[in-house]
């Protein structure tokens, strides 16, 4: 008994799937089961096997990789139309389907692994070659723009945004009113429906991959910005109280310890926050009044000569 791996695709229903997968030489006990009877027993064995559902899922996953988006509902409809697994197994048992033995188990396992590997190869092929096609179209657009001076998307209002789902269609609208030609003798430039679906699908997958790759970093950056904003913002009207004191003592904006104690009571801030606010405020206003800066520095040195005054900023 020998199972072979056909080149064509696995069918959607159990009977045709079994007919296309194993070699007709399979029969109970390993003997020759040619003819219609042997084929029916073989179908029943595959349909009743525990790995049949997994094999069907792997096959459908391969079909989905390169199927245009607008054609995916047809696959879903075919899957929904097939009988439930329990009904299929009951029908196989009623037909006298054999278990298949170790050779059928090995075949089903290898076929599932083969389809999973094939799916990965298909995904890689679609991504690489589709991106090459997209880049080729982009280079053609750039060459056309350099020749004509007209932007391909000019007048369409197309923008890149997360909520835009029909960018490919908006780009195709450039050729509305034409017969598919570019109007300059360069031949047809419009993509077919399948090509547009493929480009849209690749673009959507790449955008999702980029989002997932940078999502955590973007969230961390946003949280850091918000944290700094919260840390640098004084609560309530405390800033107004400090600014009022600053305006009243603009000639000498250095509060004494008693002044700081009163400001702590009035604002509810900590002494460190009061000190930091005045340090930053003096830095912001250092160059606003250069004429009096020399006088302020001289007066400050006289006051802090005993070494017990505020630290210089």
Swiss-Prot record:
MF term (GO), any: DNA binding
Primary residence: nucleus
Known tissue expression: Isoform 1 is expressed in roots, leaf blades, leaf sheaths and flowers. Isoform 2 is expressed in leaf blades, leaf sheaths and flowers.
GO terms classed as biological process: regulation of DNA-templated transcription
DNA-binding region per UniProt: 226-289
Localization per Swiss-Prot or TrEMBL: Nucleus
Biased amino acid composition, Low complexity: 14-27
Biased composition (Gly residues): 28-38
GO cellular component: nucleus
Keywords from the UniProt entry: DNA-binding, Homeobox, Nucleus
Annotated ELK domain residues: 205-225
Chain intervals for the UniProt region annotation (Disordered): 13-40, 282-313
Pfam families: ELK, Homeobox_KN, KNOX1, KNOX2
Family: Belongs to the TALE/KNOX homeobox family.
Name of this chain's protein: Homeobox protein knotted-1-like 2
UniProt gene name: HOS58
């Amino acid at each position: 008994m020998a199972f072979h791996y056909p080149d064509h695709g696995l069918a959607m229903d159990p009977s045709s799937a079994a007919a296309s997968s194993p070699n007709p030489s399979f029969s109970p006990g390993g003997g020759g089961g040619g003819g219609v009877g042997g084929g029916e027993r073989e179908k029943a064995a595959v349909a009743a096997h525990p790995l049949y559902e997994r094999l069907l899922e792997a096959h459908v996953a391969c079909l989905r990789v390169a199927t245009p988006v607008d054609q995916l509902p047809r696959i879903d409809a075919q899957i929904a139309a097939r009988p439930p697994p329990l009904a299929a197994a009951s029908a196989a048992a009623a037909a006298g389907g054999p278990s298949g033995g170790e050779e059928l188990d090995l075949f089903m396992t290898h076929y599932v692994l083969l389809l999973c590997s094939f799916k990965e190869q298909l995904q890689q092929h679609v991504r690489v070659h589709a991106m090459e096609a997209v880049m080729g179209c982009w280079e053609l657009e750039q060459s056309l723009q350099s020749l004509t001076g007209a932007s391909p998307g000019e007048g369409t209002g197309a923008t890149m945004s997360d909520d835009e789902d029909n960018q490919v269609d908006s780009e195709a609208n450039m050729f509305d009113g034409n017969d598919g030609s570019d109007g300059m003798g360069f031949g047809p430039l419009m993509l077919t429906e399948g090509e547009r679906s493929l480009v849209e699908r690749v673009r959507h997958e790449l955008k999702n991959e980029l989002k997932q790759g940078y999502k955590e970093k973007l969230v961390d950056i946003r949280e850091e910005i918000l944290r700094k904003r919260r840390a640098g913002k004084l609560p309530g009207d405390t800033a107004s109280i400090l600014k009022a004191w600053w305006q009243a003592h603009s000639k000498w904006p250095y509060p004494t310890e008693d002044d700081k104690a009163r400001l702590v009571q009035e604002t509810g801030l900590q002494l460190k926050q009061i000190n930091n606010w005045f340090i930053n405020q003096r830095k912001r206003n250092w160059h606003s009044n250069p004429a009096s800066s020399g006088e302020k520095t001289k007066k400050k040195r006289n006051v802090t000569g005993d070494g017990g005054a505020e630290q210089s900023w």
